[in-house]
A protein has these predicted regions:
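Conserved, well-structured ligand/cofactor-binding cores
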Residues: 2-540
Length: 540
């Protein structure tokens, strides 16, 4: 592509090179590839923003096409857009939004594949892929997403031109905007400033809808393991030091609930982005958008997306404030922070296998070292942490971008959309992968965990209500000093029998609210020692 021809005063278009056509915008003439469904303004955007080498998120592409379809339907209903043109725009949009039917729907009445139907599906898939491939604007682009909006306008206009030609209308040549105009027809009653934020919010809602079942898979995996590990007694740890016992199942149940609470907060945040500013046009005043159109386009979007969308209470506020996206990102950050904590816990509990905690074994999914034979690393947990670090970083980007708007518009929306959609995508994929390749295959090293717990000096804590803090502390110090267990020393001193200790230190006695043993046991205390009259608290 050459930008040299951009001359608005030039009276006649230059001759294009082979394989190109000439289009004109307010900056002048420009070559556009013959086979492109995009047009001159997209071509300028491609030329101006070769930043990341990536393209718009697929969810954002489908969302903006969905907005264009809803707008065309609304404009036809108000009588402003001729139905012949509007229907062509809607048909072009449907080619991009089309979803392949379920596999069973491709079978004929005899239960075998229908070649004609299969060929039709293949042709639709090919056309859909071709059209989506024409969305080329880098996520780091012109402020507010103008290039992305025009990319959608041009692709739909050029495809509508072809569809109308099949019906005998127009030349059918891409770039013949006298037939269907990207601005006057596809963008009718719209501005980038209401199209892009609406598209961004719908795409985010779509990906939240995808994330929820993935998160549920992860929650379910932890819940299953919590039941499986409910009888596995292990040492708790605070400050990275031995603490009172806990059941491994309790830890896994807490992980499941932690994730569920995060998902609930995300769903609450998602309600705020159900409010759409479509109809706001440029600055939120709704200039050039009829009230009837605004009501219809929101209704159409709700119908097309399946989301419970609503029009903004105040279009000016909804246009300049990015608070709803900030709330979604903050909820994602919260989930990510919790998942890092869980990941680090699992890595610690699985550390070793011979010189670490070794209380659990994570599934071996690939060799861990190119130099140390037989080494296996907690790669899924490591990957989870890295994904979450990215989400946390994306939230920082969104916070800065949300704060950077001026007056009636926040022009940083493209980076907000890009990072929010990336966060949802990688968290969704990671949740499924972590559930499948890690959590479901975790094994508890029961005997080893029990042995470590038995050697913990913190086992003096359930004895404190019977013995008092001072005597329990003395026993704990002796255990550490002599590298022996609390059980051994208590039995040696004759304070409790082995049988009493078996009941007193049973898993559920140690890991449920209340005093272990419920004061059912009487210790043999040193002569002259006065036992406590009730439970004695011991801080951690």
């Amino acid at each position: 592509m050459t930008q040299a021809a951009a001359n608005p005063a030039q009276a006649t278009p230059p001759t294009p090179r082979p394989g190109f056509r000439i289009e004109k915008d307010p900056l002048g003439y420009l070559e556009v590839p013959d086979g492109a469904y995009y047009g001159v303004q997209t071509a300028r955007g491609i030329h101006n923003f070769p930043i990341s080498g990536t393209r718009p998120h697929p969810a954002l592409v489908k969302a903006i096409v969905c907005v264009k379809k809803a707008a065309a339907r609304a404009n036809m209903a108000t009588g402003r857009l001729p139905k012949q043109l509007g229907n062509a725009i809607v048909e072009a949009a449907d080619e991009i939004l089309w979803s392949p039917p379920a596999r069973d729907d491709e079978l004929g009445s005899d239960g075998h594949s229908d070649p004609m139907r299969a060929g039709f599906q293949a042709a639709r898939l090919a056309k859909q892929a071709e059209l989506i491939d024409n969305f080329r604007i880098d996520p780091f682009q012109a402020g507010a997403g103008t290039s992305h909006n025009m990319n959608a306008n041009e692709v739909l206009a050029n495809r509508a031109i072809e569809l109308l030609h099949v019906s005998g209308v127009g030349s059918g040549k891409r770039g013949d905007y006298a037939v269907v105009s990207p601005n006057d027809h596809v963008n009718m009653a719209q501005s980038t400033n209401d199209v892009f934020p609406t598209s961004m919010r719908i795409a985010t809602l779509d990906l939240i809808r995808d994330f929820i079942p993935a998160a549920e898979e992860l929650i379910h995996a932890f819940e299953q393991k919590s039941r499986e590990f409910d009888d596995v007694l292990k040492s708790g740890r605070t400050h990275m030091q031995d603490a009172v016992p806990i059941r491994l199942g309790q830890e896994f149940a807490a992980y499941a609930l932690t994730i569920r609470r995060g998902v609930e907060r995300l769903q609450t945040a998602g309600q705020s982005i159900a409010e759409q500013n479509i109809g706001a046009t440029a600055v939120g005043t709704g200039l050039n958008a009829e009230p009837e159109y605004i009501e219809l386009v929101v209704r159409n979007l709700a119908e097309q997306t399946g989301h419970h969308l609503r029009g903004a209470e105040n279009l000016v506020q909804a246009t300049h404030s990015m608070r709803p996206m900030l709330e979604v990102s903050a909820a994602l950050r919260g989930i990510a922070v919790d998942l890092v904590k869980i990941s680090e816990d699992l890595r610690l509990m699985s550390s070793g296998p011979m010189t670490g905690f070794g209380e659990i074994t994570l599934p071996a999914v690939q060799p861990g070292s190119s130099i140390m034979p037989g080494k296996v690393n907690p790669v899924m947990a490591e990957c989870l942490s890295m994904v979450c670090f990215r989400v946390i970083g994306n939230d920082t980007t969104i916070a800065w971008a949300a704060s950077a708007g001026q007056l009636e518009l926040n022009v940083m929306m493209p980076v907000i959309a890009h990072t929010a959609l990336e966060s949802l995508t990688i968290l969704t994929n990671m949740s499924r992968a972590f559930a499948e390749f890690c959590v479901t295959g975790i094994e508890a090293n029961r005997e080893h965990a029990r042995d470590l717990m038995e050697r913990s000096s913190a086992l003096s804590t359930p004895l404190a209500p019977y013995l008092g803090y001072a005597l329990a502390a003395d026993i704990s110090k002796q255990a550490v000093r002599e590298n022996r267990t609390i059980r051994e020393i208590v039995i040696e001193r004759g304070i409790f029998s082995a049988e009493d200790l078996d009941q007193l230190l049973a898993p559920h006695e140690l890991t449920e609210p209340g005093v272990a043993g419920g004061f059912r046991f009487t210790p043999r205390l040193p002569e002259g020692y006065k036992p406590p009259t009730g439970p004695v608290g011991a801080g951690g």
